[in-house]
Amino acid sequence: MKLIYTEMSYSMTEILVNEARKAADQGYRVFYIAPNSLSFEKEREVLTLLPERGTFSIIVTRFVQMSRYFTVESSPSKQHLDDTTLAMIFYRALMQLKPEDLPSYGRLQNNSVFIEQLVELYKELKNAQLSVHDLTGLDHPQKQEDLIKIIELAETIMIQQDYNQDSPLQSFARAIKLGLLNNQLSKTVVVIDGFSRFSAEEDYLLSLLNNNCQEVITGSYVSQKAYQKSFIKGNIYEASLHFLQDLAQKYHIKPVFATSNQVFKPAFSRLTQLFEATHDFSQVDWQLQKNDLDHFSLWQCHHQKEEIEHVAKSIRQKLYEGYRYKDILVLLGDMDAYQLQIGPIFDKFEIPYYLGKAEPMAAHPLVQFIESLERSQRYNWRREDILNMLKSGLFGCFDDSDIDRFEEYTQFADIKGFTKFSKPFTINSSRQYPLDFLNEMRQDIVLPLQELFKSQKQLGASLVDKLILFLKKIRLAENMQGLAQSQLEVEKNEEVWKRFTDILTSFHHIFGQEKLRLSDCLALIKTGMKSAQYRVVPATLDVVTIKSYDLVQPHSKPFVYAIGLTQSHFPKQIHHSGLLSDQERARINEIRNYRHFDIASAENSKKNHQTALSLFNAATKELVLSVPTVINETFDDLSPYLKELINFGLPLLDKGKNYLSYDNSDIGNYKALLSQIIAINRQDLIEMSDQDKMFWTVVLRYLRKQLRKQQLELPTSDYRLSTKSLSKEVIEVCFPKGIPLKLSATALTVFYNNQYNYFLKYVLNLNKTESIHPDSRIHGQYLHRVFERLMKDHTQEPFDNKLKQAIYHTNQESFFQQVYQDNAEAEYSLAILEDIVRSTAPILQLNQNIKVIDQEKNFHLDMGNEILVHGIIDRIDQLSDGSLGVVDYKSSANQFDIGTFYNGLSPQLVTYLAALKQIAPHDINQLFGAMYLHLQDPKLDLVTFKQIDNTLVESIYKALTYKGIFSEVEKEHLSTGAYQTKNALYSNDELETLLNYNKYLYLKAVKHIKKGHFLINPYTSDGKTVQGDQLKAITRFEADLDMAQARRLVTLPAKEKKECFLTLMRKESHL
């Protein structure tokens, strides 16, 4: 054993490479060992330092792969044991145990987190070279008994299934101990670089290598000043000193100091000395020199996105100066927080990168497909799960448009559950869904799923065969190939597919002869897929490397950017969570020699010092350390290590916001510039932050409130939301010349409510999602149908019998059967509707002097060449004197208000009067009115009645009255019926005024509509609040900001309101 240490200003790799070259020149085979996370980079660095740039005598590798380079005569290789396979083995072991067999863990047998913790514990035991029987001194002795039962049973299964229980290091160590490699190892030299500690497994292997190899050489960074210290607690070199001291004591050798030819910039050395002095309680009488500051930068940004963009711009600047991507390293303080953001931003700046972290498979479409398949079986064909399977792109041969159409129909018809999916689709709507096509698609989906899901409990091998057959039927493999759109995606899909097939193979091997339910089979495969990871090697070496900052080594790259160095992440506080606590691990370590658990929390301090030291020396030319004030949407403080650097004299530069400019850093990259052109042109709109905008918005609201109290008015802002006019070509297509524009009373109301709403509904023909579940529209259709049947029945049957017959026959109609007999909720709605019919029907029985002339009457009202008004009149009544009137059924309370009508928001009754006047060749004297009938079940507050008598009945019938517009000429005939004529009587001249103004409203609307310019102008009655449809999700209308765009209604005092509005109508309609 040879131990070497050196100062941070020298290159330990160069020193060790020289030792390796000497051994290789003497004919020895040299293994250059690096940590798992650094072997790829260390290999490139070692080969760069060799004069010949490559050699077969020096092999750069890891401890775990070292055994591959030795020839050992052994028995046939056993099955490989990975984490997913281990989890399946533990699941099978727990299946064979009863809850009462495990007093401590019996309730967690099927818990996936518990199984993951068992896998981690098993791996820890292997690394620590401990067995489950060594777990003494636990807080609860029952825990050890349970763990012994579980792990021993799992190991029995491993033996039965011919799995290799030993790790590669254990197998290698056993071969060395048996003397199988003595001849080969005697000609071997092992060089170890980059370690500051060994696991128990590595420590044991190292002792064997030291006894059998020609030489073992280990190096570490320690300053001469620190090496001579007797008290090292808190020293920045504490981890390395303990590492060297333990090896020196164990192998009875003294470490030697060495230097390299390569000496790094003095600025980094001086910073290291200041950092060391701060932590070893010594003092220095000098500070950093001015030119030292050129090699360090401390940045502070507002949030992560700005921080990454500043880094990207700086990288582009480095490329402009002649450097390569491979000269740059980006370190992340929090991988999870930055991983999703850094990729898109680097892509925008066209910076190729390699993220040194295995990617989880959880977001891949194949995993989403398997998860949806499992949930479809578990939750009995839930619609969302079936659709997610289709949307993954891996099920069958369906276009996106087909899937969208299928989704729209299943939502409309509320298709969910196996029963509904297995039956042909028969329900249709006004949109006329293509049922033949949808049923063909349904069969293509249901048949393979049904064949798979009907599988009963059987052997695991049989279940896998059926699953593979199902995957072939839906063309999973072919669809998987079609997902990739780039070479990188092809490589990712290949890695995911390989993991998927490995999981199926492991399941077949472990559970092949075990009886399982399909749900358990799919759940195990899903769990394995979601927890699996894959890694893709970059296609070129000239990329920016990105990795976690705690994996960095000194002198890694010329330029290093370390971002996200907040107090919460730098230093990192690691706390182990698992089946064993750190206290239990410590007690076990005390009684075991050369076998021990790794306790991360016990080494936080010295490991963090070592990481900070490596980070501060990671660059050879320039180091940038950055911290955001907001990370993961929470405020965080500066790292204590960065505060030390500030005390050393390094300035903290506030990078501020990423204001767009015409500097080289902003316009030097075409793709980044292209993505920011719009923002540059709108720079005046982003001068305030979101926080500033929110502040001034709240202030504006408060100011307006105070001004209203003082009866002052604040000038409203200019129009913020604007719309474009339709092109002439579109106008000609939508509103062709010579063809009248079709309008209804409802469409006219929508136009005067908000013009943009009319544009969406009647020009673009956008509709809300339909549903078979009864809503107010279907409830209205039901009530209309019952009363239509009732009023058509002219038999001599008692009224109650006719009412029962009308309800019965309406309920028997196929449409209403489908709607109201689908579930208990629909049946309850039907019962309420029947109560409403029974409560409202007596009003028809009371008015025996009324004769129903027609029902559900279609009309087309001609108002000139420009417009054709259409609609349906619910009922036309005739009084005893022959006068006609219109009845409109309503499921909610309605009454005619002349002010609302004047503003265009209630044209329905007057439009019906105009239609009736055109349908029947009568003059205005023979129209008695137009009215609403509120179909309701009246609710009365019995507390207001002293006793139950006729007043109670009168109150009920008082609520059931016709309300609307009535002719003053027919006053006497109306007095005997259930008509509310108070404040609702109009003379013939006044009725003519209403009819003429109604025509004016239509013509005015048509003139504006044909111009093709629709405003965002929901109406407001008071200028303070907006009552019209704002359509916020589409228009982004805000009442506080856009009140100037709202249409102000004309309102008049209640006194003489009718006369005043009629006067206005005459003026505007030119009467």
From Swiss-Prot:
Function as written in the Swiss-Prot or TrEMBL entry: The heterodimer acts as both an ATP-dependent DNA helicase and an ATP-dependent, dual-direction single-stranded exonuclease. Recognizes the chi site generating a DNA molecule suitable for the initiation of homologous recombination. This subunit has 5' -> 3' nuclease activity but not helicase activity.
Statement: the UniProt record of this protein carries the keyword Ribonucleoprotein: no
KW DNA repair (keyword) present: yes
Keywords attached to this entry: ATP-binding, DNA damage, DNA repair, DNA-binding, Exonuclease, Helicase, Hydrolase, Nuclease, Nucleotide-binding
NCBIfam families: rexB_recomb (TIGR02774)
Family classification: Belongs to the helicase family. AddB/RexB type 2 subfamily.
TM region positions: none
InterPro entries named among the record's database cross-references: ADDB_N, DNA_helicase_suRexB, P-loop_NTPase, PDDEXK-like_dom_sf, PDDEXK_AddAB-type, Restrct_endonuc-II-like
Gene3D superfamilies reported for this sequence: 3.90.320.10, P-loop containing nucleotide triphosphate hydrolases
Disulfide links within the chain: none
Stated name of the protein: ATP-dependent helicase/deoxyribonuclease subunit B
Enzyme Commission code(s) on record: 3.1.-.-
GO molecular function list: 5'-3' exonuclease activity; ATP binding; double-stranded DNA binding; helicase activity; hydrolase activity, acting on acid anhydrides
Assembly, per entry: Heterodimer of AddA and RexB.
GO term, biological process aspect, one: double-strand break repair via homologous recombination
Names of the cofactor(s): Mg(2+)
Organism ancestry: Bacteria, Bacillati, Bacillota, Bacilli, Lactobacillales
